[in-house]
Every structure is written in C-alpha cells, then in structure tokens.
C-alpha cells in the first residue's frame, strides 16, 4: 500500500467515531460544504450567516434556536415509528359512513402510490410534460361521468364533504331567484358531510334546513337540495320524484353517491340530478384514518363554467396531434380572485389517478362483480339476522344494514370488540354495519357469531340471493371506453402505468424550480410509513382506544409546529393550503363574533397576493379591499394605513404572504401587523413561503395571529402531481377556541362543529411524512435547510441577473428563497414571450419556473435547499443558452417566427420525421446542451393549443383511434 493511500485510510479511520452515520440533513440538503463555499464566493460573501444577516431583517430574527428533539437517524426513526404504530389497533371496521376498507391492487400500490415518478410531479400546468397523469385524470373524469350518468366531471376535489359544500355554492351561484337563501339537506346524509356544508353556509348567509326529504315542503326560497345515495343508514331510495319536486321550485339537486353502488344501482343522472358528488376512496385507496382520498364532482354541461376544481380537456398540439391540458382555467382563483368558482387549488391528483387505475384494472365487469359480492354478503347477513328475530330498519340496501337490537346492544358491541370488529353506533341504540370488498366467509361467520348465530351454510345461501330489486337496478352501461376493457392482467397494467409515467417530468428527472411551490426532496424514509397497515387500515371514526399511536403523532407534530410558528395551537384538519386559508379566516370570523363584533367583515389583501387569498376571503364572508404595492414590490404602507383607518370600524383582517410573493423579506412587516392590530383587525399570514422562515423567524415573532402551513411544500409531503396536500393552521392563544372541530369525533379542539374537512384530522396518514421529516432534521437541520434555500435562490439570481434582470431585491440587494426574473423586454426586442422560454426549457429537460405570477411576463424561480450545485449550474446554463437563442433572434441569426423557442418543445417524432422544414438544424432543436446526450427527457406532445381546447371542450376519453 503506497503512503498516500495509507494516509488517506488513516484519516478516514480517525474520522469514524461512535456517532451514527445515517444522519439525514446531509442527504436532504443539496450543496456540501465545498459547494457552499463556491456559491458564497460567487455572491461575494464569506459565510452563510453573512447572507442571512443581509437578506433577513434583524428585527424579525429569532433570539434562540428552535426547541425541538435532537435529530434522529433514518434507521432509528423507523424503529421508533414502528413502536408508535404498534399502539394503534387495527380492527375490522364495518362502520361505513362513507369510508370503507378495500383491496389495493399490488401493481397500483407499488407502481403509483409508492413510486416517486408519480408522487413527486407537480400540478400539470405545463401540459407537454404532464401527458401521463393528464390521461389518467381524463380516465378518472370519464369514470365519474359514466357512473354518475352526468355530462361533465372535474379531476377531483378534497373529499366528499368539501364536494358537497362546493355543490351547494354552485347551486347558490347559478340560482335564478336572487332572494332564495335556503338549502335543504337530507337528515340521511353522512353527519360529517352535513357539518362541512353548514360550516360553508354560515359565512355566506345561507340557511341550511336539515330534515326528512319526504315531508319537507319545498318552495321558491330553496335554491338547492342535497341527498345521500345510498343513505347514511344504508337505505336505497329512488329520489326521482323528489328531484322533480325540487326542479319545480327552481332548486338545483345534488346527490352524494357511492361510486361502487352505482355499478348496480340507478345513477343520479337517471334520477334527474343536476350534480353528483362523493368520494372515490373505496376504489383502491387506504382508509388512512381519514385520508387522503379523492372527492369527485360531476354535473350537467350547462354548469361547466361554474364547476369548482381542475378540469382536464382534450386539445391539439403544434403538430395536429391530440394533447391534454387543464381546461377553462379562467374559472380559477388565479384569474377571478374573489369572484372565482372556488378557492381550491391543490386537489387530490395522485388519489384520483389511483382510483382511475383501479377502474382500469378491474373494468366494468370486475367492478360489478365486486359490488355484487358485497351486496350478496350483505343480503345473506340481513336475512339470517331477520330469521333470528332481529329487526332490520332498512328494507332495501346495498352494503349497509341498520339493526334495532333493543336491550342487546351493549353485549353485541362487547362481543364485536372481543373479535376486534367495529360497528357504527347510533345515539338511538341502533347498530349500523357496512360490508366491503375485503369481507370473506370467515368474516361473515364472525359477524353472525357476534349475534349468537352459528352453523349457517353461507355458501348455499350465497347462491340463493336475489338481485337488486328491479326498480333500483341500473339500466345503463358504463366504462365502455377501451381503456377500461384492455388492462386486466398485471403485465398489461404494469406496462400501461409505466407508459404514462414516462410521459411526465417529475423530481426523478430534474429540479422543478417553481416559485412559491417548494418542490424539495420527498425522501424515501419519510414515505415508508404511509402504507403501513397500522396507519393505513384505520377508519377515521374508530374509537380513541384504537388510535393511540396516531394521537402521539398528532400531539408531537402539533407541538413541533407550534414551536416552529411561534403559535399556541395548531389544527391539522385542513386538506390543502386553500382550505387552511379558509379555516384560518373562519377562526378570525368566529373570534370577532365572540366579541360581538360580527360587523367586522373587511379583509385587506395586497394586490400581489396569491389568487387563493381573495377567493378564500370571499368564502369566509369577507369583503375584499385591495392594498397597493410600492415600486419595490412591498406593501404600500401609506395605502395600508389609509385603508385600515378608513375601515377601522369594520376591519376584520389583513392577509399577507411572508416573505412576500415578490421574493423578498419586507423590512416593515412588523409595522404592517401593528397598523392592522391598532384598527381592531387580525393578521392572517399565508404560509406558502414558510420555507424561508423555519428557524430564522416565525409568524408569531413577526406579529401574525394565524398562519396556514403547506406541509406539501415546507414539510416534505410530495405534491402528487397536483395533490394531496395538507394545510394545517397555527393560531395565537386567543384564536385557539375557534379552530375547526368535528361532529363525530373529539379532535382535541373542544369544538363539536365547524369542520372544514370530512375527517377529524383531515389527511391523517400523510402527516406522518412531515413528522418524520422534522424528527430527522432536528432544529439545526431545519434551520440549515432554510439557510440553504436562501443561498440557492441568491446563487441563481446572481448567475442570471446580468441577462435576466431580477425584478425585486431586499434593501441589501439579496432575495429570499426565490427570485423573479424579468423577461418582458424580450417581447419587444425579439418577439419572444415568457411562454416561449418556459416551453424551451422542456427541451433542456426542465420544468419551467412559475410563469407570470405575481408579475406578468416574468419567471419566479425557487430552487429549494435540496438541489446540488451541479443541478443549479445546469439550470443556469440552460437559461443562459436560451438567452443566447433570444440574442440570435434579435440579430437575425434565427428567424423571428421559425426558431427553436417558438416551436418548442420538440418531440422525438418531430426531430426524427422524414420532413424537416425549419430554419435551424434538428440537433439544435433536440440537443441544445451537451449534457442532454447523456440523458434526455422527451415530451410526448408538442406545444398544446390552449385556445382550441377551450373552444372545443372535450373532457372525457377520446375514441381509441386517437391513442394509436
């Protein structure tokens, strides 16, 4: 062994001590110490701390480190979490109420739910690099349209309760009688759905009337009705005549329907419903103690422009081929702001994809067989119970029976508990039992034994079960498109999933530098526990003694988030950032009401705010008043003072984002909070940019009263291609009593009502990801992540500022965790739009940064802390090469209309075609940078025509020829 190698070996041996080697922060943070030094040199700085001192105002800096547990290792944290998970008890839950155990096909679980190629993608704003999940979502929409018997469906909502509340708001928005303020809700709807609807109705002045649909006297004061199908107690009811009655008085009818039941039962469309809502949870999604699950929303074509959520449509690309895209985006909050159809931004794309694939894998016959088997088991169970003298209160049912057990209730429940089985308990002494896809002969025998019935020949009875009564039977076909007929072997299914995955750019391909989106690492260790049955197989309404592990997770995570935000209380219930905004504003509203100041209804919002802010304010019943920004992008203090003073008597709140949406730490943020407080208002902080705060400052330190967090941004829950997300809110002490509660479960807020989500803790199973992330990083790791996110953003800004002006900087010339590049001059000098640069980046293998927000004609870049120096440099090189292409257009070297920017992105089919008529070579089109020879991402379609797609709206699967 030579002396150099001996010395190196000796040095390595000396370095290795007793400390664990699988520490996580060095795996999560991209730049190492040497790369950090290089980046600081580029910035002309000597240390990261010097950068932070220059970028973050001294007056808002925390005085001490975060009080969090010491960082754990990856191996140790999974051991600890297994111990916590073991404190949950996984019972067979036949509770129902909209949540059901199901069998998740392994090919779908492993290759979608557990696959970063699917779960690390972003919302499909860049259609050309999102064709895979767009096709899966189009399948989802087709599935919903077919099963509900309606004409158009969106690409998912947050859950069934939210979908029902959105249906109420659509009905309210399109009502012909402006004086109609009443909304009828059947008492047979799921309790949690009623709770969410009532929460939504109150700020809007809508009167919710809950009652019996058979006896309610409808009149012109009602603008809508909501029905459950089958009913929460299991009854199957044909609502045709009632829906006609509602139409006679001008009311819009909504049916909350079970998708699996619709494979056997008459559809809402056949009954005349205007809207159908529900959950796709039983189509392959784990219970997860409440979520995440994909809600659905279908309606008639005439209401398409009022429909909430994302809508996938078919258009054509630059080559005349079919291309999918997000359609009718002018409905969304980014454009219509407080007049938007909804505030929903993040939906449940990953879960909608899984549910659609469940339908693709089983096909119509497979789904019908699953439903028929459940129905037969339920029928046998009901018949045997009747013969044994028990009273079944619902004559017609699909999967749920309600039993009048009289004095035997408690002993039945005790026997069920001894077999680790959960039933639904009603306050009037009835027992509800809902069967599902997982039920087998042994389960049914156990159920009968609980009722002291033994030695029943179930298999013989199975043969004799009659079909669904003809009056309720579905007569129409569904899922007739070839995609639902073609992939029923695992081999074919695997290849179909892989084909679609290959069409999408995710974090497995390259960095996704979207400003205000924080597309950081979603580490494998963080993702592991999501599919553990100890967490995934628990019903959201399971008794508290079965969910002690979850209780530990919630309490610890809430405590950690309180420490990070500087607040006194946290609610994990909101299922998205937009829902967190809504919940936070409702807390402010309830606070004012508790002080007899319900007249405070004005919400000040800076003109630069994200579109969800005004949309959420409108949902919470506030009047939006816009505050100007100064030339530096900061809130105009004089305008704020004037408007706060003008509305001193009715000021409810101010909504601000920090750091600002312009990518800087505003120096006057504490003064801004003081101005609002002095006028009696509360300060709501949008937590979209929390990745620049953790460990350095906090909403509480700054002076905010409430802030939502995006766990799918700052705290590592993946974006899932457009959801799931989690948007918990932190609040100051005086707002803690006004956090969202739940009608069925004590979720530790002390409130019985005011739920914003159907489940008590929202998407409970994925908050585990954030728990693991914080536990792995510890105080120092989290703070260093924040520092590095700011360093990476400033490095990119510095490298690109000579050719792309950085629009806004702080007073010392630095940005926060993101920067805005000004591309507007190129439109005049070369005819190049910001969209051309965004699409050209695809040819370089990158997802474009955020386009034209908050300033039209700009790109907002957020690299996060997870990207290495090599990746940052590769992105910068791509941007610099694109700048050279713009110069070539300016000089005439490239044609003004026929150039690589205008024709981007270039597909493999385009550059390998026999015909090439462009005024630049194929190689420049496809391989504009040297590194692309090693690894090239090919977009599946050319530039998609947005205008054509909206003018020729098609939102369900195309004929099979279009896929050939």
From Swiss-Prot:
Cofactor(s), by name: pyridoxal 5'-phosphate
GO terms of molecular function: glycine binding; glycine dehydrogenase (decarboxylating) activity; pyridoxal phosphate binding
Any one GO BP annotation for this protein: glycine decarboxylation via glycine cleavage system
Residues recorded with modification N6-(pyridoxal phosphate)lysine: 713
Protein name as it appears in the record: Glycine dehydrogenase (decarboxylating)
Keyword Secreted among UniProt keywords: no
Span list, region Disordered: 1-21
Catalyzed reaction equations: N(6)-[(R)-lipoyl]-L-lysyl-[glycine-cleavage complex H protein] + glycine + H(+) = N(6)-[(R)-S(8)-aminomethyldihydrolipoyl]-L-lysyl-[glycine-cleavage complex H protein] + CO2
Coiled coil, from the record: none
Keywords on record: Oxidoreductase, Pyridoxal phosphate
Comp. bias (Polar residues): 1-11
Free-text function comment from the UniProt entry: The glycine cleavage system catalyzes the degradation of glycine. The P protein binds the alpha-amino group of glycine through its pyridoxal phosphate cofactor; CO(2) is released and the remaining methylamine moiety is then transferred to the lipoamide cofactor of the H protein.
Top class in the EC scheme: oxidoreductase
Natural source organism: Leptospira interrogans serogroup Icterohaemorrhagiae serovar copenhageni (strain Fiocruz L1-130)
UniProt family annotation: Belongs to the GcvP family.
């Amino acid at each position: 062994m030579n002396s150099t190698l001996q010395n190196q070996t000796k040095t390595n041996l000396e370095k290795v001590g007793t400390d664990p080697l699988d520490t996580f922060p060095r795996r999560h943070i991209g730049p190492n110490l040497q790369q950090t030094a290089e980046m600081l040199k580029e910035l002309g700085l000597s240390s990261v701390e010097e950068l932070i001192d220059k970028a973050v105002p001294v007056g808002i800096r925390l005085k001490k480190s975060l009080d969090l547990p010491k960082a754990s290792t990856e191996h140790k944290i999974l051991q600890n979490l297994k111990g916590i998970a073991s404190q949950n008890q996984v019972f067979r839950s036949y509770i129902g109420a909209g949540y059901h155990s199901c069998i998740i096909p392994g090919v779908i679980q492993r290759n979608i739910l557990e696959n970063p190629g699917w779960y690390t993608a972003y919302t499909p704003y860049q259609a050309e690099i999102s064709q895979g999940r767009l096709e899966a979502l189009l399948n989802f929409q087709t599935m919903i349209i077919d099963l509900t018997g309606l004409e158009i469906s969106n690409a998912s909502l947050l859950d069934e309760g939210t979908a029902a509340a959105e249906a109420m708001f659509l009905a309210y928005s399109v009502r012909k009688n402006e004086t109609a303020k009443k909304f009828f809700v059947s008492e047979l709807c799921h309790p949690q759905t009623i709770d969410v609807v009532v929460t939504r109705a109150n700020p809007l002045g809508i009167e919710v009337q809950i009652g019996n649909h058979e006896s309610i006297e409808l009149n012109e004061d009602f603008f809508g009705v909501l029905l459950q199908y089958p009913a929460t107690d299991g009854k199957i009811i044909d609502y045709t005549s009632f829906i006609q009655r509602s139409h006679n008085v001008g009311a819009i009818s909504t049916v909350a329907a079970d998708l699996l039941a619709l494979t056997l039962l008459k559809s809402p469309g056949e009954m005349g419903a205007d809207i159908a809502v529900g959950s796709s949870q039983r189509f392959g999604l784990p219970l997860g103690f409440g979520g995440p699950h994909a809600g659905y929303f279908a309606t008639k074509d005439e209401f398409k422009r009022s429909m909430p959520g994302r809508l996938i449509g078919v258009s054509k690309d630059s080559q005349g081929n079919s291309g999918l895209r997000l359609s009718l985006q002018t409905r969304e909050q980014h454009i219509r702001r407080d007049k938007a159809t909804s505030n929903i931004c993040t939906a449940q794309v990953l879960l909608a994809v899984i549910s659609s694939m469940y339908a693709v894998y089983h096909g119509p016959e497979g789904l019908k067989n699953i439903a028929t088997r459940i129905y037969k088991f339920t029928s046998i169970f009901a018949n045997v119970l009747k013969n044994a003298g028990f009273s079944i209160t619902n004559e017609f049912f699909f999967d749920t029976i309600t039993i009048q057990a009289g004095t035997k209730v408690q002993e039945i429940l005790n026997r069920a508990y001894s077999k680790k089985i959960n039933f639904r308990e009603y306050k009037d002494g009835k027992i509800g039992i809902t069967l599902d896809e997982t039920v087998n002969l042994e389960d049914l025998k156990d159920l009968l034994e609980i009722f002291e019935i033994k030695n029943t020949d179930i298999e013989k009875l199975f043969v004799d079960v009659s079909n669904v009564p003809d009056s309720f039977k579905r007569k129409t076909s569904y899922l007739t498109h070839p995609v639902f007929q073609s992939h029923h072997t695992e081999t074919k299914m695997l290849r179909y999933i892989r084909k679609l995955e290959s069409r999408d750019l995710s974090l497995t391909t390259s960095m996704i530098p979207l400003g205000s989106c924080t597309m950081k690492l979603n580490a494998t260790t963080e993702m592991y526990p999501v599919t553990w049955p100890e967490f995934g197989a628990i019903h959201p309404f399971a008794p508290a003694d079965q969910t002690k592990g979850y209780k530990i997770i919630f309490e610890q995570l809430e405590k950690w988030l309180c420490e990070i935000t500087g607040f006194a209380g946290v609610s994990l219930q909101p299922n998205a950032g937009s829902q967190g905004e809504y919940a936070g504003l409702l807390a402010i509203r309830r606070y004012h009401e508790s002080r007899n100041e319900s007249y405070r209804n004005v919400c000040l919002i800076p003109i630069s705010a994200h579109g969800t802010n005004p949309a959420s304010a409108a949902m919470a019943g506030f009047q939006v008043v816009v505050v100007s920004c100064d030339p530096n992008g900061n809130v105009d203090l004089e305008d704020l003072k004037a408007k706060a003073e003008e509305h001193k008597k009715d000021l409810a709140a101010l909504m601000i984002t920090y750091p600002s949406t312009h990518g800087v730490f505003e120096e006057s943020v504490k003064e801004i909070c003081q101005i609002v407080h002095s006028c009696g208002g509360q300060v709501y902080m949008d937590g979209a940019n929390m990745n620049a705060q953790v460990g350095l400052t906090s909403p509480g330190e700054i002076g905010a009263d409430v802030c939502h967090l995006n766990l799918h941004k700052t705290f590592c829950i993946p974006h899932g291609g457009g959801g799931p997300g989690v948007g918990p809110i932190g609040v100051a002490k005086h707002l803690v009593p006004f956090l969202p509660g739940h009608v069925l479960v004590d979720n530790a807020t002390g409130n019985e009502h005011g739920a914003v989500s159907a489940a008590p803790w929202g998407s409970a199973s994925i908050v585990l990801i954030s728990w693991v992330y914080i536990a792995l990083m510890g105080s120092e790791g989290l703070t260093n992540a924040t520092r590095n996110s700011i360093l990476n953003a400033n490095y990119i800004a510095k490298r690109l500022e000579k050719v792309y002006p950085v629009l806004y900087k702080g007073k010392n010339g630095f940005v926060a965790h993101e920067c805005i590049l000004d591309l507007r001059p190129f439109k005049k000098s070369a005819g190049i739009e910001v969209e051309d640069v965004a699409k050209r980046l695809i040819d370089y293998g990158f997802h474009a940064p955020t386009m034209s927000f908050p300033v039209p004609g700009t790109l907002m870049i957020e690299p996060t802390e997870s990207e290495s120096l090599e990746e940052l440099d590769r992105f910068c090189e791509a941007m610099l090469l694109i700048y050279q292409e713009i110069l070539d257009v300016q000089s005439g070297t490239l044609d003004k209309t026929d150039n690589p920017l205008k024709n981007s992105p270039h597909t493999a089919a385009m550059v390998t075609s026999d015909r090439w008529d462009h005024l630049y070579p194929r190689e420049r089109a496809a391989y504009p940078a040297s590194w692309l020879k090693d690894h090239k991402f090919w977009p599946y379609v050319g530039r998609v025509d947005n205008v054509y797609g909206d003018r020729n709206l098609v939102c369900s699967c195309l004929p099979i020829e279009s896929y050939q």
